[in-house]
Every structure is written in C-alpha cells, then in structure tokens.
C-alpha cells in the first residue's frame, strides 16, 4: 500500500467513527429532554453554548440568575449583563436591549465566554428540562444550564 492509500483509509475510518459518536450522543440528548419547567427562577451555571463545552478549570463558569420579578443578571467573570425577561413556558424572551458593563477583561477565555453568552441571550429561546436540575435553551443558539446550589 502506498502512503496515499494509507491516509485515505485512515481518513475514512476517522470520519466513520466521528459520525457514529455524534449520532449516539444526539440520540441520548433527545431521550433525556422533557417538558418545559414551570419556573426557571434561580441561579444557573452555563455549561455549554452551541457546540462549545465551557470549563471552569481556568475561568469560572458563566452564571445566569433569573429573579422572580422578571429581572435577569448574567456574568461570565468580568462584565455583567442585566435586563428583563419574560418566561411563559416554554418560551423565554429577553428585553430588546440588555445592559452590559464595559470593563476591559484581562482573560481571552472570559471575553470569549461573554461574547457567546450575549449572543445566546439575543433571541427568544425554547426552554426544556434536560435532566435533573438542568435546562436546555434553544433559539438562534443553544445553551445548557445547570442549577447552581448555594
């Protein structure tokens, strides 16, 4: 076998494996999603935005806090987003303009997380329970939130 054939077959094997792993994780996610929760009030850590799994190894998880008077506050480690929200299960809508502090953040990962969070909060989201103390939010972007126990 020449080098081209070896690389070709390795590439095919890699793609086949990647597709199989993706399919099984999608079916698992679909089976664990249930109806919209009655309430989203409380503090939630953001564990995933779109396909990006967030880690708290170097920077803290972003946090979104929903208050019962329709106020929302979010922070990814530097700047704070705040505004109003309306939740009528399963639809979650944020006020047109969320306020954001404009501090210069020294960490690139925090800055990236803040940008992802602001983008994800810029649309109407459909909220579903996706496990014990977990919420899945889908709109223009996807977010996975886990209840923060204080």
Tell me what each language-model feature is:
Residues 19-150:
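Lipid interaction determinants
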Residues 10-13:
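Short, linear, compositionally biased motifs with a strong N-terminal bias
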Residues 1-8:
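Bacterial N-terminal signal peptides that target proteins for export
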């Amino acid at each position: 076998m020449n080098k081209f054939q070896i690389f070709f077959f390795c590439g095919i094997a890699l793609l086949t494996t990647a597709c199989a792993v993706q399919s099984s994780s999608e079916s698992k996610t679909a089976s664990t999603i249930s109806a919209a929760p009655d309430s989203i009030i409380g503090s939630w850590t953001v564990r995933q935005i779109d396909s990006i799994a967030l880690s708290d190894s170097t920077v803290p998880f972003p946090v979104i806090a929903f208050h019962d008077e329709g106020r929302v506050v979010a922070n990814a480690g530097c700047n704070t987003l705040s505004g109003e929200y309306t939740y009528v299960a399963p639809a979650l809508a944020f006020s047109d303009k969320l306020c954001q502090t404009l501090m210069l953040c020294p960490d690139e990962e925090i800055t990236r997380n803040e940008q992802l969070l602001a983008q994800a909060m810029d649309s109407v989201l459909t909220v579903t329970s996706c496990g014990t103390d977990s919420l899945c939010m889908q709109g223009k972007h996807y977010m996975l939130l886990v209840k923060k126990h204080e």
